[in-house]
Amino acid sequence: MSHSVLPQLKPKDFASDQEVRWCPGCGDYAILKAIQKTLSELEVPRENSVFISGIGCSSRFPYYMATYGFHTIHGRAPAVATGTKLANPDLDVWVITGDGDGLSIGGNHLVHALRRNIDLNIILFNNEIYGLTKGQVSPTSKRGTLSPTTPRGSVANPLSQATMALGVGARFVARSVDINHAHLVEVRKQSHGYAGTSFVEMINKWI
């Protein structure tokens, strides 16, 4: 009895047919390419993968992946992802969020997802600003940042996601940067291999 062997998927096989609509030069492009390469090298089946996002520039992500996807409401991606994983334990569940979406209105959902430690891959894009709504300060904006909502400068100190994640009991916490493609891929591989909630902060530029 012969068994057919499926060809290994390439990074481009994880790209959907949708036009990528981020601003030219945005670091989100590099993160998208790195995750597509990661899934290819890990030989993750597309039909077993789902990307779940909230609202913001990073939250366009599910549209650009040739996998299952769910574009939810502001800040609720970790809650939807938790339900998805509990109902479908065999699914490879990824959460895509940003510093505004995940640390402001969605901060409570993120905290409890990290605390529960079920098998989720959480990626937080940190560009230190609300990019989609044209540059208001976010929870990670540096003190003194000038913006439409802080014309005299932000008075708050930036929130450290890594410190917060460790403080609520996260077991896998990492950080990478959009300009180091090899490191992006390696960090994603390691976090994917962790059998619990992994949290990776992706520092990326905003144009």
State what each model feature region is:
Residues M1-K10:
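Short, charged low-complexity linear segments at domain edges
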Residues K10, D90, S138-G193:
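Conserved thiamine diphosphate
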Residues N48-G54, V95-G98, L124, S176, ...:
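Beta-strand segments within the central parallel beta-sheet cores of soluble alpha/beta enzyme folds
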